Amino acid sequence: MENLTRELRKADISLCLDFVMNHTASTHRWAMAAKAGDATYQAYYHCYDDRTIPDQYEQTVPQVFPNTAPGNFTWCEEMHKWVLTTFHDYQWDLNYANPAVFVDMTKSILHLANLGVEVFRIDAVPYIWKQLGTTCRNLPQVHTIVRMLRMVLECVCPAVILKGEVVMAPKELAAYFGTPEKPECHMLYNVSTMVNLWGALASRDTRLLKAQLDALHALPDNCWFVNYLRCHDDIGWGLDEAVENRLGIDPQKHKEYLYHFYEGNFPGSWAKGELYNYDPATGDARSCGTTASLCGVEQ
């Protein structure tokens, strides 16, 4: 890693590394120790002997992948315990209510910074704090943890940048910058603009995009967005429903139009995307595809 970052720096390239905040792999050494019965490392995760507490969580916590990874908990035969797994059964959610987790995660990021990593793309940030009776998304404690991490970095390696991967509703996004007095992420992916660009292209209506850009321009100067067209993730059609309603757009019908358009299942569509995670109960779905496929280059 040191050799890589050294060579990159010679070419004026800063290395950006993905740093997953919410979970570890089930094969990570912490998880393996937990499976072996080490109570210290079992406390690094959310482990339960029976379904009492997991069932309480399931009442309020949405499922990320209801079709491919239903439920938010996985049974671990080695421990004879249920483990919180928000995304997939092989991704164990960390328990930040245990201070040792924050300490060890901070040690990990500082170790990588010492090896020359200059930008950290902190992944799945909104999910890192769990609290019964909530959606376990965007809770106040999440912002406290990100702020603490930023404070440590500013003290130890102030040139390091935190780039937040926050795939949430527009109203939740800007909060991850913090405030000028209490900053959190240096940069955020501009998810809302990406979604609204594709929405405007399919609908040939720029009103939602303009409203979203107007809201961005009203943010303080410390808000630094990374604009992009596509990435490895699907497109979740999380448009601002309040703005849609104000403009006379039916949010559900508009969403259905967009994901059908981008799978090529609509008259006049040029796209060759794929429908992803369709939920017939809610009518919700996401869209997958490269920029070329969604723009109709294959046609």
Regions found by a protein language model. Give the residues of each.
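Active-site and adjacent substrate-binding regions of carbohydrate-active enzymes
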Residues: 1-299
